[in-house]
């Protein structure tokens, strides 16, 4: 009897304990299945989406896999949370912090918008489109030639070629007529994929922030150029000559080198917009002939042409001789100051071999003040001297300082 009881007890224990073993095994398997696996998460993401990191905006972007016609969208916090929930719905354990750690790592390939645009340009079909593009503004041969050169410098800047010769020349579209689409033309030079890197909002008093724009923007429009102050103009000329930048980004302690991308273009409703003759070589002034037609501009082929020309060694910088020609051409766009008008009434430049006086700036101004004292207050000696040289007056360096070779004339001549 005891033997029978013992047998029944063993059988009962076996039936009671077996489910527990099975349940324990099942629980263990579920724990393994529910354990976070970065590889499963990455496989899911790479199977369903494309990711990339924009090195200019420092923003992650994504789009559905295989949807090449769709543009990439910014991957913000809301999109990141939606992705996390989607992965969890697919039965894959995922925490938002783990997903963010992956997305914000070097495992996501980075890209440069301008480099990518140039790489994806079509082959040039051989048709010259730069003449037509320039002629939409003016058919003047001078403008057509140098606008082409400037466009080469613009693309060279985007391609990273312009490290020695910064694109330090800016076209200025001038028209006293309103509504001739000067600003629209400037913006239409920016390809659609790069429109985010065009701006006409510029504050020349914001030093560091403005230099930062040179490393991010592709084209900066100096809209209403004639409103710039003298201080702003000096700052602008300095910025235009920078070929490389040293920028400290937000939340970083150290400065880092940054290549310059930006080129400048500008518009004006006034013709007398330049006040520094020696610095005018930085501005390619053109008077707009008519309302600009901004339709049907084939930018892919225009930039494909420029790319092909650069790859065959076409020069993209302006020579000193070309800068001198630009400076001479810009005489029609100078501001004429009172002291210059008065000077022309009483002096002229001496001809070669002609008897003349050798006068200093102070001596010239003393003569003018005797006759027109009230009109000659706060005259800038430097600007006045530069204006004389720009107008053709010969300047001679002597032991007593600079002297100007002049002949006196009557105001009525």
Feature-to-residue mapping (PLM):
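Conserved AAA+/SF3 P-loop NTPase catalytic/coupling segment centered on the Walker-B
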Residues: 217-241, 274-279
């Amino acid at each position: 009897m005891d033997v029978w009881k013992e047998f029944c007890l063993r059988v009962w224990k076996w039936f009671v304990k077996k489910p527990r073993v099975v349940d324990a095994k099942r629980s263990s398997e579920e724990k393994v299945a529910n354990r976070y696996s970065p590889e499963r998460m990455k496989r899911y993401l790479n199977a369903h989406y494309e990711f990339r990191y924009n090195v200019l905006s420092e923003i992650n972007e994504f789009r559905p896999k295989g949807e090449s016609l769709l543009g990439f969208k910014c991957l913000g916090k809301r999109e990141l949370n939606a992705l996390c929930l989607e992965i969890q719905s697919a039965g894959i354990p995922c925490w938002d912090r783990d997903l963010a750690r992956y997305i914000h790592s070097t495992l996501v390939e980075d890209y440069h918008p301008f480099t990518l645009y140039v790489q994806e340009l079509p082959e040039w079909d051989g048709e010259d489109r730069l003449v037509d593009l320039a002629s939409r503004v003016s058919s003047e041969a001078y403008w057509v030639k140098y606008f082409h050169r400037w466009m080469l410098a613009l693309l060279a800047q985007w391609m990273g070629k312009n490290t020695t010769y910064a694109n330090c020349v800016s076209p200025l579209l001038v028209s006293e007529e309103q509504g001739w689409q000067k600003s629209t033309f400037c913006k239409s030079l920016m390809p659609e994929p790069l429109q985010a890197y065009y701006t006409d909002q510029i504050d020349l008093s914001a030093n560091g922030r403005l230099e930062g724009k040179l490393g991010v923007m592709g084209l900066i429009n100096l809209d209403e150029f004639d409103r710039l102050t003298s201080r702003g103009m000096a700052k602008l000329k300095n910025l235009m000559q920078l070929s490389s930048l040293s920028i400290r980004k937000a939340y970083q302690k150290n400065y880092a080198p940054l290549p310059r991308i930006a080129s400048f273009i500008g518009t004006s409703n006034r013709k007398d917009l330049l006040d520094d003759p020696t610095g005018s070589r930085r501005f390619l002034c053109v008077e707009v002939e008519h309302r600009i037609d901004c339709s049907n501009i084939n930018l892919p082929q225009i930039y494909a042409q420029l790319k092909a020309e650069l790859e065959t060694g076409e020069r993209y910088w302006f020579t000193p001789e070309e800068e001198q020609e630009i400076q001479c051409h810009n005489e029609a766009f100078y501001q004429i100051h009172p002291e210059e008008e008065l000077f022309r009434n009483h002096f002229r430049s001496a001809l070669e071999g002609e008897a003349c006086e050798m006068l200093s700036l102070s001596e010239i101004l003393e003569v003018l003040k005797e006759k027109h004292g009230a009109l000659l207050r706060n005259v800038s000696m430097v600007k006045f001297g530069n204006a004389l040289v720009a107008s053709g007056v010969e300047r001679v360096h002597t032991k007593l300082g600079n002297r100007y070779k002049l002949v006196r004339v009557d105001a009525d001549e």
